[in-house]
């Protein structure tokens, strides 16, 4: 599996995310086994898997919304959907206590600096979910006042399509984020291990489900959905 390595450089020339340099590399744990004995290599693998397990099953969302997609997001916290099953029911009012931010709704140019400031106030490790067509690409608002995709100023980990997406789509996006976190390679501290962040290159769902969707011949009417 290929990984995207991001090394943070505070003195980087660019002021956009990701700050620093980014390159595609192989799995760092696999490559590092050549220079380690079996015990230390296995210990690092188990320790990394344990830390990632704790991170992905205890994701605290930041209570933040922009438009109608936020209503669908909050619906996922109700009893019929029960987002507590995934350990993400602890809504935080402060970005300093949150693990991930969901950009749900239309991002206007005047709001972009505010969103970026809130993202900077979040502590590492942190993740971003772009929810809805407006957050992904501007949606139907192809005008001067709307940012055509929040990934122009934030590093987005998961994109959720729809206008607006259903709560089930948000839950699936959360599970995809958990899967991605489970395969990340992060330093255990600021003095232990490689100080780069390795993110696995996850395949797009449209590519994984392409053959399955092509084989669908019985199309239901909107009343039956």
Swiss-Prot record:
Keyword Ligase tagged: no
Record's function text: NDH-1 shuttles electrons from NADH, via FMN and iron-sulfur (Fe-S) centers, to quinones in the respiratory chain. The immediate electron acceptor for the enzyme in this species is believed to be ubiquinone. Couples the redox reaction to proton translocation (for every two electrons transferred, four hydrogen ions are translocated across the cytoplasmic membrane), and thus conserves the redox energy in a proton gradient.
Residues binding [4Fe-4S] cluster: 68-69, 134, 163
Names of the cofactor(s): [4Fe-4S] cluster
Subcellular location: Cell inner membrane
Cofactor binding note: Binds 1 [4Fe-4S] cluster.
Entry's EC annotation: 7.1.1.-
Family classification: Belongs to the complex I 20 kDa subunit family.
Complexes and interactors: NDH-1 is composed of 13 different subunits. Subunits NuoB, CD, E, F, and G constitute the peripheral sector of the complex.
Cellular component annotations (GO), alphabetically ordered: plasma membrane; respiratory chain complex I
GO annotation, biological process: aerobic respiration; electron transport coupled proton transport
HAMAP family on file: NDH1_NuoB (MF_01356)
UniProt keyword annotation of 4Fe-4S present: yes
Leader peptide range in chain numbering: none
Membrane topology according to the record: Peripheral membrane protein
Record GO terms (molecular function): 4 iron, 4 sulfur cluster binding; iron ion binding; NADH dehydrogenase (ubiquinone) activity; NADH:ubiquinone reductase (non-electrogenic) activity; quinone binding
Alphabetized Pfam families for the sequence: Oxidored_q6
PANTHER family reported in the protein's UniProt record: NADH DEHYDROGENASE (PTHR11995), NADH DEHYDROGENASE [UBIQUINONE] IRON-SULFUR PROTEIN 7, MITOCHONDRIAL (PTHR11995:SF14)
Keywords: 4Fe-4S, Cell inner membrane, Cell membrane, Iron, Iron-sulfur, Membrane, Metal-binding, NAD, Quinone, Translocase, Transport, Ubiquinone
Enzyme class: translocase
Membrane-spanning residues: none
Reactions listed under catalytic activity: a quinone + NADH + 5 H(+)(in) = a quinol + NAD(+) + 4 H(+)(out)
This protein's name: NADH-quinone oxidoreductase subunit B
Source organism phylogeny: Bacteria, Pseudomonadati, Pseudomonadota, Gammaproteobacteria, Pseudomonadales
């Amino acid at each position: 599996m290929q990984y995207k390595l991001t090394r943070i450089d505070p003195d980087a020339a660019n002021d956009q995310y990701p700050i620093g340099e980014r390159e595609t590399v192989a799995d760092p744990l696999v490559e590092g086994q050549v220079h380690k004995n079996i015990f230390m290599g296995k210990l690092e693998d188990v320790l990394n898997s344990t830390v990632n397990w704790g991170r992905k099953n205890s994701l605290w969302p930041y209570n933040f919304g922009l438009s109608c997609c936020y209503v669908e997001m909050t619906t996922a916290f109700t009893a019929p959907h029960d987002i507590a099953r995934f350990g993400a029911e602890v809504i935080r009012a402060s970005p300093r206590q949150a693990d991930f931010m969901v950009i749900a709704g239309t991002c206007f140019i005047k709001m972009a600096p505010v969103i970026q400031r809130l993202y900077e106030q979040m502590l590492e490790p942190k993740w971003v979910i772009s929810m809805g067509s407006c957050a992904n690409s501007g949606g139907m608002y192809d005008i001067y006042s709307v940012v055509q995709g929040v990934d122009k100023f934030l590093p987005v980990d998961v994109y959720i399509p729809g206008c607006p997406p259903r709560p089930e789509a948000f839950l699936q996006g959360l599970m995809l984020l958990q899967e991605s976190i489970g395969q990340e390679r992060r330093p255990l501290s600021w003095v232990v291990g490689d100080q780069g962040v390795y993110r696995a290159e996850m395949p797009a769902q449209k590519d994984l489900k392409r053959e399955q969707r092509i084989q669908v011949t019985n199309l239901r009417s909107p009343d039956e959905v």
